[in-house]
Amino acid sequence: MANILFIGVGTMGYPMATNLIKNKHNLNFYDPYAIEKNIKNLKSLGCIKIESLKNIPNNLDFVITMLPTGKEVKEVTIGNHGIVNYTKDNFIYIDMSTILPKDSIEISQQLKKKGISMLDAPVARLVQNAIDGTLLILVGGEKEEYDLSTSMLKCMGSDVVYCGTSGSGSKMKIINNYMSILLNIITAETLALADSSGINRDLAIELMSTTAAGKGHMNLTYPAKVFKNDISPGFKNSLALKDLRL
């Protein structure tokens, strides 16, 4: 059972905080923009709302942030009114927001000067996964702090993955999102093309699910060839270009 300050109890942060409470952790929370329903529910579960970071509790094991951008994360950590100015505890700080890796690294370096260790641990998957406690959590930072935090993080995520040194969690999240977003766009365009071409959509989906188009080159072509250092052409660029022009 850990003593935790959770900063940011919005769409994702609220269910994440709730799962920590359900797993018997002691929780204080801070969010001046939280909706009244979330505040009321958290209080009913025994959480304490702090009105200012000046009132940061003593004897914390973890401080967790789940905020919209790096600007807000910096403000509540290393800003003029951030936690670094109001505590002497040697807690582990965990940022679960999706922010620039350079911001994660900068915050980590500044906190380290004050004796505070940091993990960047952005989450993947959907709001329902946050509710169910089945998020994917991608962690960057020192391995020792990761090991100390894993059991607590597993209250919020079914898959907790150590990605490497400071900033690695943020980098992996952005890389994953980059591929996921592009694949989503391509999928929508492909199905729209099938519709406009008069091809039955169910047929197109069934067919493409058996090829690299649906299964993904990451699962087929790359393990079979590229990851084995075999980069010999399997399909000429000129032929690929010809097909795209059709």
Model-flagged regions — what are they?
Residues 170, 217-246:
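Interdomain hinge/lid region at the active-site interface
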Residues 4, 99-178:
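Rossmann-fold dinucleotide-binding core
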Residues 199-212:
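Small-residue-rich helix-loop
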Residues 167-193, 236-243:
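Mid-domain beta-loop-alpha active-site segment that forms a flexible
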Residues 1-58, 62-65, 91:
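NAD(P)+-binding Rossmann beta1-loop-alpha1 motif at the extreme N-terminus of oxidoreductases
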Residues 53-118:
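Rossmann-fold NAD(P) dinucleotide-binding segment
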